[in-house]
Amino acid sequence: MAKKFRVFTSFAIEDANLRTMLVGQGRNKNTPFEFVDMSVKEPWDSAWKTNCRTKIKGCDGLIGIITNNTVKASGQIWELQCAYDEGIPVLLIYGNDDRPANLPDPVKGRRINLWTWDNISAFLDKL
């Protein structure tokens, strides 16, 4: 049986459906990858950044779903920057075919991959 990785999924709240699809793919017996979703599913109290940092640090990697909503998603932007600051491996994937014209600082200049099973598998294989 393949190792299950602890993966934090970072997404704009408007893109919660994409997170659900990604997690569903990870549970599909036909996909070549499997992971335990560690994303924030409900808003935390005022100490959410502390709780979130702890959760991110406890993960093997982070998958960031990038869409036009990302640029204004302050929580997602913070999560991505946190993962980079903590040295957590990050895979950025496009959430759809509509490529964002504007990207927030943590994403600018970084490779954003197509959402494919091969790309996700390759990322998990490196963890």
Predicted segment positions?
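Switch/connector loops and helix/strand junctions flanking conserved nucleotide-binding motifs
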Residues: L18, A73, R99-L103
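Inter-motif core of Ras-like GTPase G domains
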Residues: L62-G64
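Conserved N-terminal substructure of TIR/SEFIR domains
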Residues: M1-G58, I88, N96, L127
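Structural motif corresponding to alpha-helix initiation and N-cap regions
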Residues: S46-K49, I77, W117
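C-terminal helix of von Willebrand factor
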Residues: N113-L127
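Conserved TIR/SEFIR loop-to-helix hotspot centered on a Trp-containing motif
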Residues: N68-E86
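Glycine-rich, charge-decorated loop segments at or immediately adjacent to ligand/cofactor-binding or catalytic sites
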Residues: D98-I112
